[in-house]
Design a protein with these regions (language model features):
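Short, low-complexity N-terminal intrinsically disordered segments enriched in polar/charged residues
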Residues: 1-33, 123
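A beta-strand edge to alpha-helix "cap/lid" segment located at domain peripheries
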Residues: 2, 23, 38, 44, ...
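General structural signal for alpha-helix termini and helix-helix connectors
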Residues: 14, 37-40
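Short N-terminal micro-motifs specific to bacterial/archaeal maturation
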Residues: 18, 43-44
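Short aromatic/basic micro-patch
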Residues: 47
Length: 124
């Protein structure tokens, strides 16, 4: 039995909530064992397996982040969603980035592949 559309769609909100909370375990709970993460697409690095994914996200959740899902679409086991996150580096320095993520899910609703589409031009 495949994951439901609602279950897959909820991944977007859970992902942004986990990043905002700085909750590495919540992020990791979204991923299947053999998952891959490419963030951003085209940078030449694909993080393969939970250990590599954990190492990647450890530095992300260490930052103070605010985020919001702007749009999400589910087609089969794929979730395409647009979001903005603002990273606060200190009291006077922050950056906002607009990102499209494509996540593929397995039958249990776990993410098997995440590809993040953004470039420096998407930052302000």
């Amino acid at each position: 039995m495949s994951a439901s559309t609602d279950q897959i769609r909820s991944t977007a909100d859970s992902y942004i909530a986990a990043l905002t909370a700085g909750d590495l375990e919540a992020v990791m709970n979204l991923y299947a064992e053999g998952a891959t993460v490419e963030d951003p697409v085209g940078n030449g690095t694909v993080h393969e397996g939970k250990a590599a994914i954990r190492e990647f996200y450890a530095s992300v959740v260490a930052m103070k982040i605010e985020g919001e899902v702007l749009e999400a679409r589910v087609c089969g086991n794929d979730l395409l969603f647009n979001f903005e996150i603002t990273t606060h580096f200190d009291a006077d320095s922050k950056a906002t980035i607009n990102v499209w993520d494509l996540m593929t899910h397995d039958e249990q609703g776990k993410v098997t592949s995440m590809r993040a589409y953004w470039t420096p031009e998407n930052m302000r």
